[in-house]
Amino acid sequence: MQILLANPRGFCAGVDRAISIVENALAIYGAPIYVRHEVVHNRYVVDSLRERGAIFIEQISEVPDGAILIFSAHGVSQAVRNEAKSRDLTVFDATCPLVTKVHMEVARASRRGEESILIGHAGHPEVEGTMGQYSNPEGGMYLVESPDDVWKLTVKNEEKLSFMTQTTLSVDDTSDVIDALRKRFPKIVGPRKDDICYATTNRQEAVRALAEQAEVVLVVGSKNSSNSNRLAELAQRMGKSAFLIDDAKDIQEEWVKEVKCVGVTAGASAPDILVQNVVARLQQLGGGEAIPLEGREENIVFEVPKELRVDIREVD
């Protein structure tokens, strides 16, 4: 059985930065460190940080006075940010800079009195944070997930209308929704480049190339990871058997029985150690050496806050 690896796969710059912020805060300040929501959507990462003293909470009221609080990579609403400011807390922001870019787009629209439409998945923390940047009572902020949502939507003023997108969506699905928005509201204004981040786009391109060769595609990522789910869905749309797995233990032997080629990729919040474990398990099931496919090179780095720029080895 041939094993192919998608390229790129795994951690993106925003996830790297968010995890480093929590790790460095633990190294500098010691446990406990409070993190609002899972810092990234990966069970292995969250469990590892929890073992080292990170406490993951959903409400600011759960954080004691004087504590260290970190916002997750998904971002938070202005209401959450203001609540944290009103408390005696030291706050570090691990929001991905590409999510912050979308927040700024919404805030500008709010200041101008433009109504805004966000393309995204209801209930996702990134969507909640982005929707929460809009505060103009004279305007309006709306969420759509599909072209059907667009055709049902009524706004106050079609002349002053803009749209934004969640950063981890399906490129193909989002294109369909944007097309519907432009037909429904001809004067709508969008970002010069859509808000889907480079890592989401690159990993979807990579899984498309992977699925062209592999009979079965394994996507390493947690069930609550939006970008990981989109990778599995894309492979399935291409007619391949695709499975979203947290780790190697989730692999069922019948998935790869009599399969000649299996492909492996990982969502942007999944560490490479999990991919290595998946490859090792596939090799136990008869797989050969893992062959990485060619793909886009990624060299983007997002700096951590200057207060947390430390060599952890020196602290240890």
From Swiss-Prot:
This protein's encoding gene: ispH
UniProt cofactor(s): [4Fe-4S] cluster
UniProt binding sites for (2E)-4-hydroxy-3-methylbut-2-enyl diphosphate: H41, H74, H124, T167, S225, S226, N227, S269
Active-site residues, Swiss-Prot/TrEMBL: E126 (proton donor)
CC cofactor note: Binds 1 [4Fe-4S] cluster per subunit.
Functional note: Catalyzes the conversion of 1-hydroxy-2-methyl-2-(E)-butenyl 4-diphosphate (HMBPP) into a mixture of isopentenyl diphosphate (IPP) and dimethylallyl diphosphate (DMAPP). Acts in the terminal step of the DOXP/MEP pathway for isoprenoid precursor biosynthesis.
Amino acids binding [4Fe-4S] cluster: C12, C96, C197
Pathway linked to the protein: Isoprenoid biosynthesis; dimethylallyl diphosphate biosynthesis; dimethylallyl diphosphate from (2E)-4-hydroxy-3-methylbutenyl diphosphate: step 1/1; Isoprenoid biosynthesis; isopentenyl diphosphate biosynthesis via DXP pathway; isopentenyl diphosphate from 1-deoxy-D-xylulose 5-phosphate: step 6/6
Gene3D superfamilies: 3.40.50.11270, 4-hydroxy-3-methylbut-2-enyl diphosphate reductase, catalytic domain (3.40.1010.20)
NCBIfam families tied to this protein: ispH_lytB, PRK01045.1-2, PRK01045.1-4
Name assigned to this protein: 4-hydroxy-3-methylbut-2-enyl diphosphate reductase
InterPro entries xrefs: LytB/IspH (IPR003451)
